[in-house]
Regions:
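Acidic, glycine-rich two-metal-ion catalytic cores of nucleic acid-processing enzymes
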Residues: 2-14, 26, 33-42, 46-48, ...
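Active-site-proximal helix-loop-helix substrate-binding element of RNase H-like nuclease domains
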Residues: 2-12, 42-277, 363, 372, ...
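Phosphate- and divalent-cation-binding pockets in alpha/beta enzyme and binding domains
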Residues: 101-104, 351, 487, 589
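Core structural elements
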Residues: 233-248, 260-277, 282-309, 345-356, ...
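Conserved catalytic core of nucleic-acid polymerases
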Residues: 245-251, 300, 304, 359, ...
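Secondary-structure capping and boundary motifs in well-ordered enzyme cores
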Residues: 250, 254-261, 286-294, 320-324, ...
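Extended, well-ordered alpha-helical scaffold/bundle regions in very large, multi-domain proteins
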Residues: 287-393, 582-591
């Protein structure tokens, strides 16, 4: 339910701007907000075409305004400059995903540097229990949050725009289908279709290594004719298969409806704040939001630096990896006795159960690793050859999963991003996890070299990223060892319920030396935690040693020692399970 009464206004003339400024000066503001509608999502290459802003007053009257850069460019710039001046006086100035909008304003040389910035996502995180949405926690999406907690119709205008984008994409795609059918093009027999349909095309391009150049010659000719002559220039560079609705930028949609959508974004931001701010106070979590606020501008600056890359190296590596994937698929088909995709989990499980006599219930990596380990240790069957074929089948499956993920998720994506800029850029999410950990879309970027089974290097991420920006000769990688588990151990102490085993993994907790007991608050104890002999309080003759928590989990789960040849590989699974549990994963997802 809305707390404020709202008025909307599009700024179309200088008089509209003057009226807005006069109204601002005549009201007492509780909070303000801003947002941008942009040509795309690239934080450097894209630009805003619509700027919307507003405030809510102490009398709970709210006002939203929008100005269009494409329709009135000079007025729009003047409006943003004037609004920046006014916004600097607000008690709090909000956006939803504020760093993105700050990047957009910087892209048009209208940056905002006020110290009153905040983000509604901070308020959502700190005013709710730390739970994921599937576990009863709040969604972080603005419209998702508003529709759940403020107004059930909050997604109305978004749905209208989504439908318009979907209809536009469908129109382009139907044109391709018609051209293919008129040309008499027939899809390959394995697709079991008499003529090309959109579902056939989608099936073809689901394969991460499939491109338009892999189409049959007649279909390829029609496809490129469609791409070059029927698709607008602003859309051509985004297409790798058929047109998807998310490729249609907002500035190509119905302007009147878009303005309504923009106004309501300000409403949902400020209504969310009105709901959440008193809860934040009641939970005594305001300090957390203040700390997050101080990080906004430094993180924006970090995001805008980007990574210099060796584009030639990437362009050369992509066909190498593609060729190797195709080669390994043939080996996988030979082992399976049929052609199948790595995503056909049910069929793969049937092959493991029947052909190789391996009783697995799923094809997730952990269970397959355990099956391999079991074969090596005790032999599931007495058929030596079949056992090693089974291991080869599982290893090839896992290898292909890695190869295809690297190829599609990273290599092709990077190549696409480099069409718009000469560097790779990442966004940093301050509240992306319920644990409070900072995340980014580069977080899972591979660090190890991608090699063939014979050890031939295919692609090295470290060779992709180049040193730049100063008199440097190397890239330094810094990593805190198991930092979250260390914090979790300390947290159990601070809340008065110490987890003795977890604490002892990292510090001589409830231990002593010749000088006395260990005190985690004592700087001298901390300084000598690892270079002095400490002994357990309950077993004074037994010396304390640090514990590898991930290794301990691995040994317990797989029944192996550190000398086992599989230990290093399986330890990675132990690590994943530990962190999954730390993030609140349910039992079935951890096992």
């Amino acid at each position: 339910m809305l707390k404020a009464k709202w008025q909307f206004c599009d700024i179309e003339t200088a008089e509209d701007l003057q009226s807005m400024a006069a109204l601002f000066k005549a009201t007492t503001q509780l909070a303000g907000a801003f947002d941008t509608e942009t040509t795309g999502l690239h934080i450097i290459a894209d630009k805003p075409f619509l700027f919307q802003f507003g405030w809510v007053g102490s009398d709970l009257n709210g006002y939203t305004f929008a100005v269009d850069f494409e329709q009135t460019p000079e007025l729009a710039r003047t409006t943003v400059i004037e609004w920046h001046r006014l916004a600097a006086t607000l008690p709090v100035y909000l956006a939803h995903n504020v760093k993105y909008d700050l990047n957009m304003l910087t892209n048009i040389r209208l940056p905002y540097y006020g110290s009153n910035l905040s983000d509604t996502m901070f308020y959502i995180r700190y005013a709710h229990d730390a739970r994921r949405p599937e576990d009863g926690g709040p969604p972080l999406g603005l419209k998702e949050y508003a529709s759940q907690f403020i107004d059930g119709s909050a997604k109305y205008h978004e749905k209208l725009l989504d439908k318009e984008k979907s209809d536009m994409a469908k129109g382009f795609n139907n044109l391709l289908k018609t051209k293919l059918q008129k040309a008499g093009c027939k899809p390959p027999t394995k697709y079991a279709a008499k003529q090309y349909t959109l579902s056939v095309f989608e099936d073809m391009f689901k394969d991460p290594v499939f491109t338009a150049d892999d189409l049959p010659e007649d279909a390829k000719t029609v496809y490129y004719d469609w791409l070059n002559n029927d698709i607008p220039i602003w859309l051509q560079n985004k297409i790798t298969s058929i047109v998807e609705s998310n490729m249609i930028p907002y500035n190509k949609l119905n302007r009147k409806e878009l303005h309504k959508y923009a106004h309501y974004d300000i409403v949902w931001v400020l209504e969310s704040w009105l709901q959440l701010d008193p809860v934040l106070t009641a939970r005594d979590n305001r300090l957390g939001v203040e700390i997050e606020n101080q990080l906004i501008q430094p993180l924006v600056e970090m995001e805008r630096v980007g990574f210099a890359v060796n584009k030639e190296y990437l362009d050369n590596a992509i066909p190498l990896v593609k060729s190797y994937i195709l080669e390994r698929r043939q080996h996988f088909y030979m082992l399976a006795g049929e052609e199948l995709k790595i995503g056909q989990k049910v069929r793969i499980r049937e092959i493991l159960n029947t052909k190789f006599n391996i009783p697995v219930t799923s094809t997730n990596g952990e269970e397959l690793e355990q099956a391999c380990s079991e074969i090596i240790r005790s032999k599931i069957s007495n058929d030596y050859d079949r056992d090693w074929y089974a291991i080869d089948f599982i290893n090839t499956l896992e290898e292909l999963r890695t190869l295809e993920k690297w190829y599609a998720t990273y290599m092709l994506r990077f190549q696409k991003d480099l069409k718009y800029a000469d560097r790779l850029y990442t966004t940093i999410n301050q509240v992306g996890t319920v644990s409070g950990r900072v995340t980014s879309d580069f977080q899972q970027f591979p660090k190890d070299t991608l090699k063939t089974v014979d050890g031939v290097e295919l692609f090295s991420p470290r060779k992709l990223i180049q040193v730049s920006g100063g008199e440097y000769q190397a890239i330094v990688y810094l990593d805190y060892s198991q930092i979250e588990l260390r914090f979790q151990a300390m947290y159990t102490i601070l809340v008065g319920h110490p987890d003795t085993n977890l604490c002892r993994a990292y510090m001589p907790f409830k231990c002593h030396n010749t000088s006395g007991p260990f005190d985690y608050k004592d700087q001298n104890c901390i300084k000598h935690a690892y270079n002095t002999d400490w002994f357990y309080d309950e077993q004074p003759e037994k010396k304390w040693v640090k514990l590898d928590v991930h290794g301990a989990t691995t040994k317990e789960a797989f029944g192996i020692t550190e000398d086992d040849p599989s230990f290093k590989r399986l330890r990675y699974i132990g690590k994943r399970v530990n962190f999954a549990n730390n993030y609140g994963a349910q039992y079935k997802k951890s096992c």
